[in-house]
Amino acid sequence: MKTKREDIRNIAIIAHVDHGKTTLVDELLKQSGTFRANQEVAERVMDSNDIERERGITILSKNTAITYKDTKINIIDTPGHADFGGEVERVLKMVNGVVLVVDAFEGVMPQTKFVLQKALDMNLSVIVCINKIDRPEARPEEVIDEILELFIDLDANEEQLDCPFIFASAKSGYAMADLNDEKKDMQPLFDCIVNNIPAPEGDPDADTQMLISTIDYNEFVGRIGVGKIDNGSLKVNQEVMIVNHHDPSVKKRVRITKLYTFNGLNKVEVNEAGIGEIVAVSGIADIHIGDTICSLNNPVAIPFQKISEPTLSMDFMVNDSPLAGKEGKFVTSRHLRDRLFKELNTDVSLRVEETPGVENSFKVSGRGELHLSVLIENMRREGYEFAVSKAEVLYHTDERGKKLEPMELAYIDVPDDCTGSVIQKLSQRKGELLGMTPINGGYTRLQFSIPSRGLIGYRGEFLTDTKGNGIINSSFEGYEEYKGDISYRKNGSLIAYESGDAITYGLFNAQERGTLFIGPGEKVYAGMIVGENPRTEDIEVNVCKTKHLTNTRSSSADEALRLVPPKILSLEQALDYIDTDELLEVTPKSLRIRKKILDHTARYRANKK
């Protein structure tokens, strides 16, 4: 018989990038007494990965739990970026309700829509938390209207439309049920969660059933499966059967060696756990997302949503440039292969396969440029050295044999005086303008339907066009018929003619031809790209050239040569910049752009074909 666990609430926190959900979880942890009074707490404690802290984004879902009065609240912090949307869908299987965090100034953004749609489809209870209400330009009343409009657009039922609203400033540590209430602490949000989110239910006497929703990885115990116990209970040393809804051939008999629940930011070992609890199990070597842990006598798999397919791919290959192996710790094909396949343990939206017909090369597919650039940055920090190609979209074909390509819905906020150039550029990239509305502060919001490949390499150009004041957000929409060819880069490259060290005299002559990416003293090799040509063709330049010494005195003393500071490209800018016949060489210390074919004559022959 089904019973409710009134002492547990399972919630997910969902929001758009940078609307403050991780800060909100920090504040809930602090005010529930999870940390000791004298304990130093890092800001945004939930983002444990360096890149997450630096970029201010959440990449992997995190689990934590707090105790409020006598209720244990399991909280899952989900990524807000569309590239990590694969994480969100699965995590929602574990919870009975969501707290939707919306910025009091920015209002509803595309990712809010993406995640909310998933939550409403699964009939989850929603609490709307309007955050950052202490911002001077906050407009909470208008944002409430925007949210209700969004609910109606997403076909929410009456019960879902009648959701509670909470007004908060996670940074200042207070929440209110009404804008006129006293600004005290987070208690109104705690009460709202306990009173409005249903308790998990299940049958404690039935056979065990638990769906694995996320995978954690630990060097000591290996793979750890995390999920919610739907029925029955789990005990340490219990023998269970692993089955999978989409793959009936999976049937494995295994033993649970360790069982953990969550408390604060820590995993706590327990001997037994019952229905409604979110637990982690270790000791099962090849456990995967979507597997169901069942009792031996009645193994029934729980159905689950298949993970969204990747839309972009890049080739990762062994670095074969003349400077290969000088800066990295892990440089061989085996190192690269092991690291990429290890990433599959934790990142389920990723696909890795060996590139057919190409030695030492792996095709890595993901949900977007950010998804793959985070992987590249992580590997770089770990000491790996490799080369990557330009991102390409993954095409499908329909039943009539027509080519289909992934489409994105892009929301773009730009200053009013920049709208013309942005619309023109996106139209050239096969974008279709769907809507244009003025918003506060002299900005216009543009809505485009655009092929995913139209956005590859555009973000850097966009920031230049809007003088750094534009915001661009996009979410995957689906596959449509191929829209035709897009010409990407309008500029050619300045290519190094010979190998050696860059010298001021050579750079001084080269800088007249375009913008340089390198400074004096840097090592270069023939075929490496050292700058950008304002015209469309590639030009070879000799940056290692020295001044010829003669025994004739100069009529005027040599003037000191003045170099323009080089344009140093970040990882994202370099990935945006490279063309289809180029590679990005990634090492722990450097990023170098090069031609795929380094030799000048061989490259000339290949281009003539």
Regions found by a protein language model. Give the residues of each.
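P-loop NTPase switch module centered on the Walker A-proximal segment
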Residues: M1-V102, E106, E146, I215-N218
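Interdomain boundary/hinge elements
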Residues: V41-R44, L154-I166, P200-L211, V240, ...
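Conserved Switch II/interswitch segment of TRAFAC-class P-loop GTPases
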Residues: T78-F84, L92-L116, L120-E142
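Canonical P-loop GTPase G-domain recognition
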Residues: S125, R135-N195
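Helix N-cap motif at beta-to-alpha junctions
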Residues: S233, A285-D286, G366-L372, D416-T419, ...
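Long insertion/accessory domains within large nucleic-acid-processing enzymes
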Residues: F262, K267-V270, L404, I450, ...
